[in-house]
Amino acid sequence: MSILPLIAANMCIASWGVAYMNVIVIGGVRDVYKRQTTDFTWVTGSQYIYSFDKCFFMPADFTGGLEYNQDNLTDDMWGYNRYTKQEVRIASAFFQNEWKNKQWSFLLGGRLDKHNMVDHVIFSPRANLRYNPTENMNLRASYSFGFRAPQAFDEDLHIENVGGTVSMIELAKDLTEEKSQSLSISGDLYHRWGDFQGNLLIEGFYTLLSDVFALRQIGERDGIIINERYNEKGAKVYGLTLEGKIAYRSLLQLQAGVTMQKAEYKQARAWSDDETVPMEKKMFRTPDTYGYFTLSYNPFVPMTIALSGTYTGSMMVEHKAGFIDKDIAVNTPDFFELNLKAGYDFNLYKGITMQVNAGVHNIFNAYQSDFVRGAKRDSGYIYGPGMPRSYFAGVKLSF
């Protein structure tokens, strides 16, 4: 048995800061406030790898390591006495061993995390099995466990502020981490027909969530709405994904995929502070069907034409009262967003390439049609494609 060790250490330091001012006019009164958000994150870690010619019954790779992550965030809204300071520290150790040959692979591993907002160490196991009955068939089964730690800051607070609502989040005394368990089974098929080659992936997935995070309004303090983050029973997401790819030489390539899923809570939950609003079991902003496709055509080497599209099925979205009289759950229409891009490459000098491109985003202008306006609008009532039909042109240099 031979052991080939590899030691890797890395450190990444990043900082980000943003400051901006909003002006709100409510009932003829002009209210100006400033808000500053700063976030500083740094990560360091090391990794150690052993490669075994044979570990018990077949060759294997062992990976182990340590990681430390710290994030310091402050969010200060001047004039509203809303100041949030959140410090997150995560110390982690991870390990896995993968036995593999051409036909089989078995992976067993886990991760230990100590989060400063959780009073115990969290163990997250994972396992993966691969079997290749033939060279053109790949079968996989995998299991993983994950968690999301409590946090008091939520970017949605900024969205609400745009609409004139000022709120803060407090953590419930008995709040615990949100946990997930995921299982997936897939089959990957490859085939070649003369100048054509294709690939088909079929995957079924099931994710079970427990102690799901939720928010409820518990009061008001100095004009600021106080929301409490607490744990609900749980939820599940399950479905099927189909993906395919076919290519003809280097001339034409088509790739497409579709996912059909169900995402729902174990029990119907109250999402509105108005007790007369019906509870919902279905997860908001999770369509039952969504998909994509990309078609690339290379009529000659320097030129590429790409047609792409995304489909988003109907989903349920919250529309809060203000502009409307009462909170309602809206079933959105489905959207198909089609894009076209053409590019031409010019070889400038010794490996330096310049590409000139142009195209159209969202050709059919599939876009939300019921935007609301005014001081009482729900600023979070936004769904669908991010922009209407738009035209673009660009230049890219590659070295």
What function would you assign to each model-found segment?
Residues 1, 9-17, 30-119, 198-204, ...:
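Face-selective signature of the C-terminal outer-membrane beta-barrel domain
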Residues 12-16, 64-70, 108-112, 127, ...:
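Transmembrane beta-barrel strands of outer-membrane/channel proteins
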Residues 13-16, 140, 174-230, 236-238, ...:
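Membrane-embedded beta-barrel scaffold of Gram-negative outer-membrane proteins
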Residues 38-42, 87-91, 121-123, 179-183, ...:
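Residues that define the transmembrane beta-barrel architecture of outer-membrane proteins
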Residues 50-56, 98-103, 123, 131-135, ...:
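Outer-membrane beta-barrel strand-turn architecture
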Residues 59, 81-208, 296:
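Structural signature of Gram-negative outer-membrane beta-barrels, strongest in the C-terminal barrel
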Residues 100-105, 204-208, 228-320:
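Gram-negative outer-membrane beta-barrel transporters
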Residues 312-320, 344-399:
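C-terminal beta-signal and adjacent terminal beta-strands/loops
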